[in-house]
Amino acid sequence: MEPNELKRALGAGLLSFPVTPFDDKGEFNPDVYGAHIDWLSGYDATVLFAAGGTGEMFSLSPDEIPNIVATAKAASNGVPIVGGCGGGTRVAVEIAKGIEKAGGDGILLLPQYLIDAPQAGLYAHVKAVCDAVGFGVTVYNRDNCVLQTETIQRLADDCPNLIGFKDGTGELGLVRRITATLGDRLTYIGGMPTAELFAEAYLGAGFSTYSSAVFNFVPQLACDFYKALRAGDRATCENILNRFFFPFMDLRSRQKGYAVAAIKAGVRLQGFAAGSVRPPLTDLTSQEVDILAGLIEPWKQ
């Protein structure tokens, strides 16, 4: 897929990050993954992200990621697949090349591990990855990789295949300056945990879409919220927030890492054998799974 084609797809509707299922030995389970991707592709997400943050990219080895992307691509029924990419620069370059070779439509470049870096170093890191591939690159602005306006402008000027900017900082002043400065050069994606909680604010800051984690297990609910948001139907948005998203936020906030573990539990509750999360994350307790089951019961499929 050409970078600008991916850019248009990213901005055309709701996005999501499927979980990565593991078997009893903790290995990638392609059969369950393919079935889950096939199910999700029947809803209205315009791009799916394989091995992204919700897909536990941080717990995957670099050589696992291309196979996960290829499996998603084969099962997605034409929905574009973007692969998660990260680590130090050399590792990220190799992962990006592997995703491109596996048939992925682009990458999401997650922050480098552990180390903080100055803007000049972040520029060099992102540019090296962009230069290594021909497809579209979306940079994830959060944690150790918070790009300032001047840096993202420079990258947009120097990297034609940089087509997306995803924000997970919640710094609306910064991101509004970026959207005002770069205009339609990039597609802007909301990337806060449980992004629906922040979607109205990000829409006002120039972000047309976001990645929905709960789309993994209540896809119709996620689509209904997105449609209400884009239609300016605040009453429907608030109804869904009160009935589902605020209680889900309370559950998700019980432990660090539950932003991923709770999603995987929801996928299991919908009948997909997604397995456990890999360390250092931990699964929900049985009591917490029961709470989640009650929460999703009205939208059980």
UniProtKB/Swiss-Prot annotation:
Cited InterPro entries: Aldolase_TIM, DapA-like, Dehydro-deoxyglucarate_dehyd
EC number: 4.2.1.41
Pfam families in UniProt: DHDPS
Annotated metabolic or biological route of this protein: Carbohydrate acid metabolism; D-glucarate degradation; 2,5-dioxopentanoate from D-glucarate: step 2/2
Gene Ontology BP annotations: D-glucarate catabolic process
Keyword NAD: no
Keywords: Lyase
Segments traversing the membrane: none
Any one GO molecular-function label of the UniProt entry: 5-dehydro-4-deoxyglucarate dehydratase activity
Keyword Lyase: yes
Catalytic activity field: 5-dehydro-4-deoxy-D-glucarate + H(+) = 2,5-dioxopentanoate + CO2 + H2O
Family: Belongs to the DapA family.
PANTHER family cross-referenced by the UniProt entry: 5-DEHYDRO-4-DEOXYGLUCARATE DEHYDRATASE 2-RELATED, DIHYDRODIPICOLINATE SYNTHASE
Protein name, per record: Probable 5-dehydro-4-deoxyglucarate dehydratase
